[in-house]
Amino acid sequence: MTDSFPFSVQESVPLSRFSTFRIGGPARYFKELTSVSEALTVFSYLHTHPLPYIIIGKGSNCLFDDQGFDGLVLYNNIQGQEFLSDTQIKVLSGSSFALLGKRLSSQGFSGLEFAVGIPGTVGGAVFMNAGTTLANTASSLINVEIIDHSGILLSIPREKLLFSYRTSPFQKKPAFIASATFQLTKDPQAAKRAKALIEERILKQPYEYPSAGCIFRNPEGLSAGALIDRAGLKGLKIGGGQISEKHGNFIINTGNACTADILELIEIIQKTLKKQGISLHKEVRIIPFRL
């Protein structure tokens, strides 16, 4: 079947290798993207040859099914960056967001210090409008290049895109994010702030275990982690999955967790908080075996 594709694909690639949860069965088809031109070829093909597909980056916000994915998984590994001016930088979407924040802050640029603790790609950060209590991706974004559903490369200025808390227009109208351009400022204190952010995250979050980061979005004015803590759920374990004792909004893989373990913990948290009149909405992407 792979011979029918006009580009190279792999079969039966374990998705656990591409998930920070370390959970997931095999992808029926798997394609690594390493350039924008390659992505254009792939999406032009998909426009005329419908096939279920998903796009992944670092897999830091995904929970794959134990059966895997019955379709094509596109792994975005398109990396690179260039300064368009002294304080504007264009970054390809498969680049590490955390590494970008670290490098820029160490060079005296402010605007993306918060990225140092976000273990995903630039494309994933734009898609989720990733951020912290201090800032989010849209705060310094000035332009996004996308490949639309018909395989055409488009450049969209920030003012034409509507972002909100952990939400971008690309969640409702899927497109492949090819690059993002950010506006920076020069600030010699940027590295100090980035270092403090990393130290705080290491102290408060369970980096020693595989996880997908925060499972739930924070309700307005509230902390999901604090709510889960107050509900007495921290430390609850099902199979190999556990609600972190360090941070209530993290579910960790203690070694042999399966998808069902994580989903059951998510359901317990949601039902428990619902009884208190609080609705928690998932931040993590649950990717089923079949779309």
Curated annotation (Swiss-Prot):
One of its GO terms (biological process) is cell division. SUPFAM superfamilies: FAD-binding/transporter-associated domain-like (SSF56176), Uridine diphospho-N-Acetylenolpyruvylglucosamine reductase, MurB, C-terminal domain (SSF56194). It is found in: Cytoplasm. Residues 22-187 form the FAD-binding PCMH-type domain. GO terms for molecular function: FAD binding; UDP-N-acetylmuramate dehydrogenase activity. PROSITE patterns: FAD_PCMH. It catalyses: UDP-N-acetyl-alpha-D-muramate + NADP(+) = UDP-N-acetyl-3-O-(1-carboxyvinyl)-alpha-D-glucosamine + NADPH + H(+). Its cofactor is FAD. GO terms for cellular component: cytosol. The keyword RNA-binding does not apply. NCBIfam families: murB, PRK13905.1. Belongs to the MurB family. This is UDP-N-acetylenolpyruvoylglucosamine reductase. It comes from Chlamydia trachomatis serovar A (strain ATCC VR-571B / DSM 19440 / HAR-13).
